[in-house]
């Protein structure tokens, strides 16, 4: 190899021109991944907290409104009366015996925008929910509790409002940025499902009016 060629190779090896662009190309995808990741995961945390607060408000409303599900009784009836025994008097606490009050079972339904109670609750909490949420993401459950109510009185179940199948939508292309940053594969999803959230409260009397 001639001295001229050797000199050219050494000069090229010592040349620092363009190194800044190379470093920028390496660092920029990592920076963007961290930056947009902080934004999206911050949004996800905020939406999760707001959804929890929405469930608390929904349960408070559902506890004092007519049932959102069909088939929920309005009054507590007698349970099974054993032969040759005196039926319990109206006004007897349900907790006084296992069969004092009839157990209508647990009644569950999905939120329906056509139901007045579900519609009122959705109008109150929809602003706190992710934009992809609909009334169908709400589930209402009315469960009998023998510690509540008395024979002949208004039915007072434990009311549970649950949000389910709620997805968070990422707005940043985190998968593509991760690939540019050198991450193997691209397994980051565009959506992430929130865990089921629920709040339970004892019903006051499942009032027959609205907005009261």
Where are these regions (language model features)?
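N-terminal signal-anchor/signal peptide hydrophobic helix marking the start
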Residues: 17-30, 40
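Membrane-proximal amphipathic alpha-helices
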Residues: 40-54, 67
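A broad detector of short, well-ordered amphipathic alpha-helices
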Residues: 16, 23, 49-57
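Short, conserved structural patches
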Residues: 2-4, 56-212
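N-terminal leader/signal peptides at the extreme start of proteins
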Residues: 1-17
